[in-house]
Amino acid sequence: MGKTNLGIDQEGFPYIAIFAFSSLIFAILGWWLLAVLCLIGTIFCGHFFRDPERIIPTEANIAVSPADGKIIRIEPRQDPISGESHTCISIFMNICNVHVNRSPIKGQIEAIQYVQGHFLNASLDKAAKENEHCSYLLRDQDGKQWVVVQIAGLIARRIVCRTKEGDILNRGERFGIIRFGSRVDLYLPEEYTPTVNLGNKVIAGETILAKKNQE
C-alpha cells in the first residue's frame, strides 16, 4: 500500500522529482549553489520517504508498533472514537524517522474518523485533541477493540489514509503515512499490557508494544 520497488513511498515522488529537476536546470545554467541545494533536497526527500521492509513478529496475542519513533507517553486516556478510557501509548516521530504507518494487529477497520484541527507540536499533550488527526477503530479476531490515531504535527501538514471501512489489515501491513514529523497513538484493549517504557525507540511493524495478559 503505497510501497514501490524503489523502497520509497509514492508520496515522496513529487518532491523528489521537483528537487531533482530543479537541480538539473540550475546545473545547466551554471548556478551551482542552487543546484547543490536542490540536490541536497532530493537526497533528503528520498531519505524521508523511505519505506524499508520489516520483519513482522509471528507470536500470538501481541501488538506491534504502528510507527517508528520514541515512546513519549503511556497513560490512561479516552480514545477519540468510543470515548472510553484505555491505556494509550504515544509514539513521536521526528523528521529523521520512517513515516510510513503500519497496523499493530490483524483486524478489520470498523470506523475511520478524520478531524481537521491545528498544527501544534505533536509531542504536546493537547495535540491529541486539537491537532488534525485521523482515528481508526480496528476489531481483532477475538472481538477486541483497538484504536490507532495519526496526529499531524508542527511541520507535518498532511495525513495520508490508504484504507477504508471494512478493510482487513494484517499485522504490520502499511495503512498510511504522515508527512514531515508527527505522532501516532495506540489505544489498547484492557486485556493487553504495554511491553515498552517511556523513552524507548520503536520500529513500525517490528517492535512489540503490548502483550495479552495471562489468564
Swiss-Prot record:
EC number(s) from the headed UniProt entry: 4.1.1.65
Entry-linked InterPro entries: PS_Dcarbxylase (IPR003817), PSD-A (IPR033175)
Marked site (Cleavage (non-hydrolytic)) residue numbers: 181-182
Keyword terms, alphabetized: Cell membrane, Decarboxylase, Lipid biosynthesis, Lipid metabolism, Lyase, Membrane, Phospholipid biosynthesis, Phospholipid metabolism, Pyruvate, Zymogen
UniProt keyword annotation of Magnesium present: no
Subcellular location: Cell membrane
Keyword Cell inner membrane in record: no
PTM info: Is synthesized initially as an inactive proenzyme. Formation of the active enzyme involves a self-maturation process in which the active site pyruvoyl group is generated from an internal serine residue via an autocatalytic post-translational modification. Two non-identical subunits are generated from the proenzyme in this reaction, and the pyruvate is formed at the N-terminus of the alpha chain, which is derived from the carboxyl end of the proenzyme.
Pathway assignment: Phospholipid metabolism; phosphatidylethanolamine biosynthesis; phosphatidylethanolamine from CDP-diacylglycerol: step 2/2
An MF annotation (GO) of this entry: phosphatidylserine decarboxylase activity
Active site: 182 (schiff-base intermediate with substrate)
PTM sites of type Pyruvic acid (Ser): 182
Enzyme class: lyase
Cofactor note: Binds 1 pyruvoyl group covalently per subunit.
Listed cofactors: pyruvate
Predominant localisation class: membrane
Superkingdom, natural source: Bacteria
Cited function: Catalyzes the formation of phosphatidylethanolamine (PtdEtn) from phosphatidylserine (PtdSer).
Subunit structure: Heterodimer of a large membrane-associated beta subunit and a small pyruvoyl-containing alpha subunit.
UniProt similarity note: Belongs to the phosphatidylserine decarboxylase family. PSD-A subfamily.
HAMAP family xref list: PS_decarb_PSD_A (MF_00664)
Record-linked PANTHER family: ARCHAETIDYLSERINE DECARBOXYLASE PROENZYME-RELATED
Protein's recorded name: Phosphatidylserine decarboxylase proenzyme
The species this protein was found in: Lawsonia intracellularis (strain PHE/MN1-00)
Name of the encoding gene: psd
